[in-house]
Amino acid sequence: MSSTHAEIVTITLAQQILKTFDLGGPEMPAYQLVVNARPCAMCFGSIPWSGVRSVVVGASGPQVEKITGFDEGPIHPQWQQELRKRGIEVVEDVLHDEALKVFHRFHDTGQPIYNGRTGD
């Protein structure tokens, strides 16, 4: 399924387990989403709706696209500021090199790269 990205699945499971659509609601702890790379367009859109209060990112989107050939979709150039102005903290470059190694290993497997525009 093209929508089963880690961020979407994680947010969905957390909301199901906690029985709330708002992970930032009253009396909720400050939930944090930790990802190995900048969220793609779809995952980025889900973050403000989720209620998480911070996002921790390993590698940048352009780096991942270069390594893997993924098309991460149109991302606002100031995506970090867009989240921050909605009260969501953004921390970048956490374990940056380690995050890139994961994508290099994926690329080296020769597995197909899903790209909805080409039907691959």
Predicted regions: what is each one?
Residues 37, 41-44, 49:
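Conserved redox-active cysteine motifs that mediate thiol-disulfide chemistry
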Residues 29, 46-120:
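Zinc-dependent deaminase
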Residues 24-38:
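Immediate flanking context of iron-sulfur cluster ligation sites
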Residues 1-17:
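Acidic helix/loop or adjacent segment enriched in Glu/Asp that either coordinates divalent metal
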Residues 1-5, 38, 70, 74:
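Residues at secondary-structure transition points
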Residues 15-25:
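N-terminal [4Fe-4S]-dependent radical SAM core
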